[in-house]
C-alpha cells in the first residue's frame, strides 16, 4: 500500500509517496507539470524488486514549499531540494528520473556522488550541444518565455469544475491519449486540489510550469562528462526532447552509459511503455550487481 509522507525542508513541506516494496532504495523523479503520483502504475511494478519513493518537486503535487516563479533561476533548485531529501533518507539511492526529473538527478549525481548509486535517465531534457549558445541568449533576452512549450504552459487552464470533466477532456488530447491506463488518473488525483472558488485547480500553476520550461539548463553539457555512476538512458524514437544529436554526444561523453531506444514511442516513455521500461531497469540493475534475486 502506498503512503503519503512529509519531509520538512528549509522553506516548506515536501510531499513524497512511499510505494513500498523490498530491495534497494529508489527515488523516482517526475517531469515538469506532473507529480509523483502520476507514475504510480510504473512504481508499483518496480516495487516487485525495489523499494520505491517519489517526491513531489517544488511547485508540484502536494508539496507546499515556496514556489515563486520570479525566484526560480535554474534547475539547480530542484537538485538542491533532492539533496535535502536524500540527506533526510540517510541512504544512497538508485535515482530514476523522467524529463526534468532526470536532469535534476543528474545534477545531484555530479555534485554529490555519495548520494546516488546508479543513474537512470528516461528521455532527459538535454538539448543538443549546438543549441546551447542560442538557448543561453534566449534566456538572457527573455525570449525563452515565448518558446512554444513555455508559452502553452503559461496559457494552460488551471481551473476545472470536477475531476470527471478534466479526465474526460485530457483523455482525448495528446500526450495523454497515448498513455496506458492509470497514469492520467494518478496525475489528476495528486496533481489537482480544491479551488477556493469552487471546483478544482491544477497544483502546478501555469506560471510555475512555464517558468520551469524557460529556465532549462544551457550549460548541462559541462556536467555530463562528470557522471561516474552506472548509467542507463531510455528514450523514445519519436521524442521531441532528447534528440539524436544529444543521444550521440551523450554516449561519447559518458562511454560507460547503456543507452536504449524505444521505437514508436514519444517523450513519455514510462507512460507509453511501462512494462518494457521496468524490464530494462531490472536488467540493467541486475547486470550492474545492484539487484539481487530472480
Where are these regions (language model features)?
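Catalytic histidine-centered segment of alpha/beta-hydrolase-like enzymes
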Residues: 262-274, 278
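Active-site loop/oxyanion-hole signature of alpha/beta-hydrolase fold enzymes
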Residues: 57-96, 135-138, 279
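Helix-rich cap/lid subdomain of alpha/beta-hydrolase
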Residues: 131-196
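Conserved hydrolase catalytic core segment
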Residues: 91-134
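Conserved HGGG/HGGXW glycine-rich cap/lid loop of the alpha/beta-hydrolase fold
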Residues: 18-67, 85
Amino acid at each position: 500500500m502506498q503512503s503519503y509522507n512529509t519531509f520538512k525542508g528549509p522553506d516548506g513541506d515536501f510531499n513524497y509517496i512511499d510505494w513500498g516494496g523490498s530491495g534497494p532504495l529508489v527515488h523516482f523523479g517526475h517531469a515538469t507539470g506532473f507529480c509523483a503520483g502520476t507514475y504510480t502504475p510504473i512504481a508499483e511494478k518496480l516495487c516487485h524488486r525495489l523499494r520505491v519513493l517519489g517526491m513531489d518537486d517544488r511547485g508540484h503535487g502536494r508539496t507546499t514549499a515556496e514556489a515563486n516563479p520570479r525566484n526560480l533561476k535554474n534547475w539547480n533548485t530542484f537538485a538542491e531540494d533532492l539533496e535535502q531529501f536524500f540527506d533526510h533518507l540517510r541512504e544512497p539511492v538508485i535515482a530514476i528520473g523522467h524529463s526534468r526529473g532526470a536532469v535534476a538527478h543528474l545534477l545531484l549525481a555530479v555534485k554529490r556522488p555519495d548520494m546516488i548509486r546508479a543513474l537512470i535517465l528516461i528521455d532527459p531534457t538535454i538539448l543538443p550541444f549546438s543549441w546551447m549558445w542560442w538557448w543561453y541568449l534566449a534566456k538572457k533576452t527573455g525570449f525563452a518565455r515565448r518558446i512554444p512549450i513555455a508559452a502553452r504552459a503559461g496559457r494552460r487552464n488551471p481551473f476545472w469544475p470536477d475531476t470527471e470533466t478534466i479526465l474526460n477532456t485530457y483523455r482525448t488530447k495528446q500526450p495523454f491519449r497515448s498513455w496506458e491506463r492509470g497514469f492520467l488518473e494518478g496525475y489528476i488525483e495528486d496533481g489537482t486540489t480544491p479551488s477556493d472558488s469552487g471546483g478544482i485547480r491544477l497544483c502546478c500553476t501555469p506560471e510555475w510550469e512555464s517558468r520551469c520550461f524557460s529556465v532549462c539548463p544551457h550549460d548541462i553539457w559541462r556536467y555530463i562528462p562528470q557522471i561516474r555512476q552506472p548509467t542507463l538512458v531510455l528514450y523514445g524514437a519519436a521524442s521531441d526532447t532528447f534528440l539524436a544529436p544529444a543521444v550521440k554526444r551523450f554516449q561519447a561523453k559518458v562511454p560507460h552509459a547503456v543507452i536504449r531506444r524505444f521505437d514508436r514511442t514519444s517523450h513519455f516513455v514510462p507512460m507509453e511503455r511501462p512494462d518494457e521500461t521496468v524490464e530494462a531497469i531490472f536488467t540493467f540493475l541486475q547486470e550492474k550487481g545492484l539487484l539481487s534475486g530472480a
